[in-house]
């Protein structure tokens, strides 16, 4: 039955959902019109808000582009190819492939969201190479489903923010340690339930072999070849210039790689196991340099990798423009206040979760959402005598929840997989529906 429902949503999404870039453009027009209708802003002001915010995510766009590029480079190195290949051997059937990829991606996203996005996609490619009969689209949707857990894990921006001295709501709610957020009973229940149930759900979404979505064989061969190509040891090249000798020098890679390792060690000594997107990119980059052996091999791999970052580079400014309109026009505040006004001490965390899920379509950034909703939800929680830590985590889970049907965060996986958003979103709708249940139970009854 589940596979039949998933098949229905898959057909609908593949027929009517536009490409991720067009989705961003459509959202732009929707927010533009809503801002004129529901606020006192004129069309000229909405244009100003849009243009003013358009370049506000440049740093983040570069970070996400690099996580695709550096992750690809690292995965194309001999050591990582062998490691992912060994893990992929745990799956011998399509069902095992779905279970393995979902579980590994979920664990990786709990550790760090950027790490999890890349590792899940790359493992899925290895598994698809080993089990060619698996539905490649469902496999990539399974890899993306692990991202649902990220805001309840160690890189969650909201719990880490409110645990940091000097955060913008410190005078209102104080400093909230992660023992009251990440390691609370409700968060452990939600994470544990999803960690167990998501692999099983994705396994149930498998369809009969005759109905498996067909993927262009050239696509899978192309993506797999980047990662699984035969390892060929280059013979000592007869180089005629000093520049060519430097390009093929292992010494250069070792020296710069050791410098990178020194900083990585320093970072963890100073900050503990604090992973953020910058240090993840740094680790991927310098291990990629070391594992490829020579600068020339590294650059050859980088040339292949950058081809996958184009969609991310183009789309992020449009989402920044959408965020600019939502925030500057007051639309985001209106949405949050509407949910606050219909809340009581029992329903506030749950309605905070719902409102965050809706807002996430237009402001797909956990930190950005907290900057908008924190100032509204936390005073409301204090006024209703509701746990502020739980209210904050409700916003965090709302952000994570609708990521399943918001193409923004799927871009890195889609770039690596060589797929379009419509290829996985039909399955992700089912994941969205199911995950609503354990998240709601955790926020209402724990």
Regions found by a protein language model. Give the residues of each.
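Membrane-core helix-loop-helix motifs of multi-pass transport proteins
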Residues: 123-215, 410-442
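Membrane-interface helix termini and inter-helical loops of multi-pass transporters
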Residues: 39-52, 167-178, 268-275, 328-341
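Flexible loop linkers connecting adjacent transmembrane helices
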Residues: 4-9, 45-50, 75-91, 126-135, ...
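Membrane-interfacial loop-to-helix junctions in multi-pass transporters
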Residues: 19, 55-61, 88-100, 131-139, ...
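Hydrophobic alpha-helical transmembrane segments of multi-pass integral membrane proteins
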Residues: 90-123, 314-329, 340-379, 384
């Amino acid at each position: 039955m589940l596979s039949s429902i998933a098949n229905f949503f898959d057909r609908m999404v593949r027929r009517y959902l536009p490409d991720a870039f067009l989705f961003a453009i459509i959202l732009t027009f929707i927010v533009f019109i809503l801002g004129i209708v529901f606020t006192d802003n004129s069309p000229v002001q909405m244009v100003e808000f849009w243009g003013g915010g358009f370049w506000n995510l440049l740093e983040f766009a570069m970070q996400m582009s690099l996580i695709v590029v550096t992750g690809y480079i690292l995965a194309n190195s001999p050591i990582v190819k062998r490691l992912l290949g060994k893990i992929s051997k745990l799956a011998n059937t399509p069902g095992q492939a779905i279970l393995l990829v979902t579980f590994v991606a979920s664990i990786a996203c709990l550790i760090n969201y950027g790490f999890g996005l890349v590792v899940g996609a790359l493992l899925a490619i290895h598994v698809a190479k080993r089990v060619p009969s698996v539905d490649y689209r469902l496999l990539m949707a399974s890899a993306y489903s692990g991202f649902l857990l990220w805001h309840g894990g160690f890189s969650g921006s909201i719990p880490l923010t409110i645990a940091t001295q000097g955060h913008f709501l410190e005078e209102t709610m104080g400093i909230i340690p992660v023992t009251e957020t990440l390691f609370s009973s409700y968060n452990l229940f939600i994470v544990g339930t999803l960690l167990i149930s998501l692999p099983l759900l994705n396994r149930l979404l498998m369809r009969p072999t005759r109905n498996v979505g067909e993927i262009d064989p050239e696509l899978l061969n192309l993506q797999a070849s980047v990662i699984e190509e035969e390892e060929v040891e280059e013979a000592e090249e007869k180089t005629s210039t000093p520049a060519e000798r430097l390009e093929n020098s292992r010494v250069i890679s070792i020296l710069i790689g050791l410098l990178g390792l020194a900083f990585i060690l320093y970072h963890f000594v100073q900050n503990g196991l604090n992973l953020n997107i910058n240090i993840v990119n740094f680790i991927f980059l310098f291990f990629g340099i070391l594992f490829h052996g020579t600068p020339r091999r590294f650059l050859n791999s980088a040339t292949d990798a950058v081809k996958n970052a184009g969609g991310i580079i183009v789309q992020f400014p449009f989402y920044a423009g959408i965020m600019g309109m939502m925030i500057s026009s007051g639309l985001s505040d209106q949405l949050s206040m509407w949910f606050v006004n219909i809340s009581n001490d029992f329903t506030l965390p749950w309605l905070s979760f719902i409102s965050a899920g809706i807002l996430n379509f237009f402001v797909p950034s956990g930190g950005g959402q907290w900057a908008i909703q924190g100032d509204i939800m936390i005073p409301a929680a204090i006024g209703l005598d509701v746990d502020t830590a739980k209210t904050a985590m409700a916003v965090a889970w709302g952000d994570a929840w609708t990521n399943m049907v918001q193409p923004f965060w799927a871009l890195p996986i889609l770039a690596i997989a060589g797929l379009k958003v419509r290829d996985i979103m039909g399955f992700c709708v089912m994941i969205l529906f199911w995950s609503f249940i354990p998240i709601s139970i955790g926020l209402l009854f724990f």
